[in-house]
Amino acid sequence: ALRKVDRNRFVLDNVTPQPREAKRYKEEEEFPGHGRRRRRRSKGKGKAKGKGKGKGKRRRRRKGKGKGKGKKKGKGRRRRCRRGRGCKKRKGKKGKGRRRRRGKKGK
């Protein structure tokens, strides 16, 4: 439960403080036939550094037909396949889009 300590400071009193993980990087190890040696273990690298994103990975919103045509970007870096949205072999296959009801006149 939270216990109020200060005007705006609370403390968990039902949580026992966990013992900190011992320093990992110097520990003795027995090597059979070689006696004991102290070996440095790395403290771990933390998070892996992400792979850098190339220009093509940055997502751009696909500019729709309506609502003002923004500046279309250049072709950029061409990938192997230039399958567009309307391609049958595509993973996210083409949607129907917004079907416009034109009424009777403009059939």
Curated annotation (Swiss-Prot):
Q: GO cellular component terms?
A: nucleosome; nucleus
- Keywords noted in UniProt: Chromosome, Developmental protein, Differentiation, DNA condensation, DNA-binding, Nucleosome core, Nucleus, Phosphoprotein, Spermatogenesis
Q: What's an example GO BP annotation here?
A: spermatogenesis
Modification sites for Phosphoserine: 42
Q: Which cysteine pairs make disulfide bonds?
A: none
Which regions are flagged for Basic residues bias?
34-107
Which locations, inside or outside the cell, does it occupy?
Nucleus; Chromosome
Cytoplasm among the record's keywords?
A: no
Name of the protein in its database record = Sperm protamine P1
From which source organism is this entry?
Bolinus brandaris
Lineage in the entry?
A: Eukaryota, Metazoa, Spiralia, Lophotrochozoa, Mollusca
